[in-house]
């Protein structure tokens, strides 16, 4: 379900997702933001457990020259979910997606900022459970002052993060890759 309000050149669209609907509103919003990004795409999510389609979209955005950056927590709340999240880093990092871990604490923010012009913020994580199994609410913003606030927030977050892109862009040992493949079998369940 989506509702919108327009004030001057500002737009705010509220969307809600639920597991009973065949429409995957949050996933579609994220995929559209990724597809239309031209310069920058900044994402924060506590859990990065994405579909092949989402992974492909992020990798293609980076390949076409978009500065794609993803912030995940460096301090986990769930160790298995943390390990699964990290299993996605290599595939993304090798294609130019920059990965950051927030180390001062647990970052639970769920936001996506596209070219500093349009943003989504709300309760939807970049994971299977949020996108397919939970009731979620998000807001899509365009032309609002809040977008500038989000951009400044990202600047602060990046300064507090450790970039781990290089560590994961070179690949990993066979045992770690096998372990990550096993963990990914359970990704839709966590």
Which residues make up each language-model segment?
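PLD/PLD-like phosphodiesterase catalytic module centered on the HKD motif
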Residues: 10, 37-42, 47-190
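A generic local structural motif
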Residues: 27-30, 126
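Structural alpha-helical scaffold elements that stabilize or flank donor/cofactor-binding regions
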Residues: 5, 33-36
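Single conserved hydrophobic/aromatic residue that forms the stacking wall/gate
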Residues: 1-13
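Glycine-rich phosphate-binding "P-loop"
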Residues: 14-22
């Amino acid at each position: 379900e989506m509702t919108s309000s327009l004030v001057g050149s500002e737009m705010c669209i509220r969307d809600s997702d639920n597991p009973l609907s065949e429409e995957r509103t949050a996933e579609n919003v994220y995929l559209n933001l990724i597809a239309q990004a031209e310069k920058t795409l900044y994402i924060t999510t506590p859990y990065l457990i994405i579909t092949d389609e989402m992974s492909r979209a992020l990798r293609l955005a980076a390949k076409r020259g978009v500065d794609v950056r993803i912030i995940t927590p460096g301090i986990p709340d769930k160790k298995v979910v943390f390990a699964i999240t990290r299993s996605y880093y290599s595939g993304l990092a090798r294609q130019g997606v920059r990965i950051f871990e927030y180390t001062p604490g647990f970052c639970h923010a769920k936001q996506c900022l596209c070219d500093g012009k349009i943003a989504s913020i709300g309760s939807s994580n970049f994971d299977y459970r949020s996108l397919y199994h939970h009731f979620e609410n998000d807001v899509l913003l365009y032309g609002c002052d809040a977008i500038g606030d989000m951009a400044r927030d990202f600047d602060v977050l990046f300064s507090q993060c450790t970039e781990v892109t290089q560590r994961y862009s070179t690949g990993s040992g066979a045992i770690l890759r096998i372990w990550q493949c096993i963990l990914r079998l359970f990704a839709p369940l966590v």
